[in-house]
Design a protein with these regions (language model features):
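Class I SAM-dependent methyltransferase Rossmann-like catalytic core
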Residues: 40-74
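Conserved class I S-adenosyl-L-methionine
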Residues: 76-85
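Core SAM-dependent methyltransferase catalytic element
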Residues: 210-240
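Conserved beta-strand signature within the Rossmann-like core of class I S-adenosyl-L-methionine
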Residues: 179-186
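A short glycine-rich, Lys/Arg-flanked "PGG" loop and its adjoining helix->strand segment in the class I
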Residues: 166-178
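Conserved SAM-binding loop of SAM-dependent methyltransferases across substrates and taxa
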Residues: 86-98
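S-adenosyl-L-methionine
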Residues: 113-144
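Conserved SAM/SAH-binding beta-strand->alpha-helix loop
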Residues: 109
Length: 240
C-alpha cells in the first residue's frame, strides 16, 4: 500500500476509457512477484522517480494495516482499495477474510501495478485514476455483484487540491452501499479532508485508530454519508 503520501493526482489529460488496464480476462500464468526486487526497494525506486506522486519513503506497516482493517463494517465482504502500492493492505484484507475475487485494487503507478497484478492474480487489479473509479469498477465487472461495503484508501489526499479530493470521494461513494465507509490514513494531525468540504458533499468523519509504530506514525479516519444522504442513497438503490 502506498503510504499516506501516495498521491494519485493525474497530471495531464484525464485518462480515456481505453487507458484502464485490467487483469481480467488475461492474467499472468504464474506468480512471479517474489522473484523480482525486494518490495521496499521497488517502492523506494518509484519514490525516487516521482517523490510528489509517492510522498513516502517506505510502504505502510502491518500495524497500520490492522488499524485500517479494524474499521471495516461488520461482515464486510466486498472492498475496493485505492492506491494498492506494494500490497500491504491487500494482503491484510485477504488475511481478514475478504475473498480476492471480491477485492478491487486500483493503482496508478505502472511498476507497482505490475507487482500487484503478479502477486494477486485472483483479485481485480486495475491501473487507473481514482477519480474514474465508477467507470473503472463498472467496466471491470466488479459492480455486477452490487456496490462495495468499504473503500480503503492509501491515497495522499492531504497533498491534493480540494477539487481533486471532492472528485475522489464522490467517485468512491458512488461505488459504495448507502452505509458504506471510506477508510483513509494520514500522517497529519487532523483529517486530510476539511470539514467544510465534507459538509459540501454530504459526508461525516470520525477518527479511528492510531498506528504508533508505523514509520512515520499515522492516524486513521472513517468517512460516511450524512444520515440524509444515506437515506437518499437507500431509496435510489431500491429504485434501481
Amino acid at each position: 500500500m502506498l503510504a499516506a503520501g501516495a498521491l494519485r493526482h493525474y497530471h495531464g489529460r484525464r485518462p480515456a476509457f481505453s487507458d484502464f488496464r485490467m487483469t481480467q480476462p488475461t492474467r499472468p500464468e504464474k506468480n512471479n512477484f517474489d522473484s523480482g526486487p525486494p518490495v521496499a526497494w521497488t517502492f523506494f525506486r518509484q519514490w525516487l522517480k516521482n517523490p510528489l506522486a509517492i510522498a513516502a519513503l517506505s510502504p505502510s506497516g502491518r500495524q497500520l494495516a490492522r488499524q485500517m482493517i479494524a474499521e471495516l463494517p461488520h461482515e464486510a465482504q466486498r472492498v475496493i482499495e485505492l492506491g494498492g502500492g506494494t500490497g500491504v493492505f491487500t494482503r491484510a484484507l485477504i488475511g481478514h477474510g475478504i475473498a480476492a475475487k471480491d477485492l478491487l485494487v486500483l493503482e496508478l503507478n505502472e511498476a507497482l501495478y505490475q507487482h500487484l497484478r503478479a502477486r494477486f492474480v485472483d483479485a481485480h487489479v486495475v491501473c487507473g485514476d481514482a477519480r474514474e473509479l465508477k467507470a473503472i469498477a463498472t467496466a471491470d465487472g466488479f459492480l455486477d455483484q452490487g456496490p462495495a461495503d468499504a473503500v480503503i484508501s492509501g491515497l495522499g489526499l492531504l497533498s491534493m487540491t480540494k477539487r481533486t479530493q471532492a472528485e475522489i470521494l464522490q467517485a468512491a461513494f458512488s461505488t459504495l452501499k448507502p452505509e458504506g465507509r471510506f477508510i483513509q490514513f494520514t500522517y497529519g494531525p487532523k483529517s486530510p479532508v476539511s470539514r467544510e468540504l465534507l459538509a459540501e458533499i454530504g459526508l461525516s468523519v470520525r477518527r479511528g485508530g492510531f498506528a504508533w509504530w508505523n514509520m512515520p506514525p499515522a492516524s486513521v479516519y472513517v468517512y460516511t454519508r450524512n444520515r440524509s444522504r444515506a437515506v437518499h442513497a437507500v431509496r435510489t438503490e431500491s429504485k434501481g
